[in-house]
């Protein structure tokens, strides 16, 4: 693959690449990762905001932060992001696939272009980025495992022995971490956000599948399935936001990101970050679909709200 990197290239800085990092939850991921000392790659389709966020991260946290414009709904964008990191020598040790958008409307009222946008960002971009950076992480893992095995053999271990195999075994997350933002909607085909729900179900299934593929190579994959998050993605009046928080339906992005990162650094496969969301997951598995038809009649659901990537 283009841009494969040796594990011990000392001229490379380690970075966390975050999509949708110019605002909302992505910005919070960038801030909390920077607070942990990670250099940040700010990727979104908001060029000026990318630059502002990168500069603010440098000033506040003393880390390196670099902006990159990418419209992730375009099929070539993921490759462009990857090629940029290779060209600049940025070693991506953490990939956070966070970019997203939301449309509340019945299917017949959603423009085809908007459908393509949601599917492109949530499904294709996530899959392509994980393929590119996951493969790169695995190449480094193979090199590191081989190096440790050879060192063990040089120290007296027999080739193929348990001691040699143990030496080459990689720890969880040692060679890279991937975090994929899914949603509680992945567990329930949700009326008026049918495309969103379907794409988030893809994210959840995809994340679980590549968790299996990559875990033996010291690469952790964590899929996050929150309920509603208090970001501009959801267009609610302040009074309704307050009610949603009081009912435990909505979570602040700072709280969600803190829980998601804790799960990622512990190598968790799936994280459902609130008690109410965990209970909802259980109900979703047994709830007859005709019981959720009332959702389409909630006034706020009738409003067409969307946010750029």
Feature locations, PLM:
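Conserved glycine-rich Rossmann-like NAD(P)H-binding loop of the short-chain dehydrogenase/reductase
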Residues: 36-52
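The beta1-alpha1 cofactor-binding region of Rossmann-like NAD(H)/NADP(H)-dependent oxidoreductases
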Residues: 69-80, 112
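Substrate-binding pocket helix/loop in short-chain dehydrogenase/reductase
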Residues: 106-107, 111-119
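Conserved glycine-rich cofactor-binding loop
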Residues: 15, 22-23
């Amino acid at each position: 693959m283009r841009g494969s990197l040796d594990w011990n290239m000392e001229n490379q800085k380690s970075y966390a690449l975050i999509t949708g990092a110019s605002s909302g939850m992505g910005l919070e991921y960038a801030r909390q990762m920077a607070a942990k000392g990670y250099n940040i790659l700010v990727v979104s389709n908001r060029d000026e905001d990318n630059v502002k966020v990168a500069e603010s991260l440098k000033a506040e946290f003393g880390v390196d932060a670099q902006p990159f414009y990418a419209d992730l709904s375009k099929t070539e964008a993921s490759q462009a992001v990857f090629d940029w990191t290779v060209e600049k020598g940025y070693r991506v040790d953490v990939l956070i696939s966070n970019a997203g958008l939301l449309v509340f409307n019945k299917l017949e009222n959603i423009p085809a272009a908007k459908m393509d946008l949601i599917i492109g960002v949530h499904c294709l971009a996530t899959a392509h980025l994980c393929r590119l950076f996951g493969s790169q992480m695995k190449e480094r893992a193979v090199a590191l495992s081989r190096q440790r095995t050879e060192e063990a053999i040089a120290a007296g271990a027999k080739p193929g022995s348990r001691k040699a195999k143990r030496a080459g075994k990689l720890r969880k997350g040692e060679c890279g971490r991937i975090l994929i933002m899914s949603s509680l909607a992945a567990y329930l085909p949700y009326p008026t956000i049918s495309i969103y729900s379907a794409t988030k179900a893809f994210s959840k299934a995809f994340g679980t599948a590549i968790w299996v593929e990559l875990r033996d190579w010291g690469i952790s994959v964590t899929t996050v399935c929150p309920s509603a998050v208090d970001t501009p993605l959801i267009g609610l009046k302040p009074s309704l936001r307050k009610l949603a928080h009081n009912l435990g339906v909505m979570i602040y992005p700072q709280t969600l990101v803190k829980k998601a990162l804790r799960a990622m650094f512990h190598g968790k496969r799936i994280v459902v970050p609130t008690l109410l969301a965990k209970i909802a997951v259980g109900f979703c598995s047994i709830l007859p679909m005709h019981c959720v038809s009332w959702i389409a009649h909630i006034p706020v659901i009738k409003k067409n709200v969307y946010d750029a990537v």
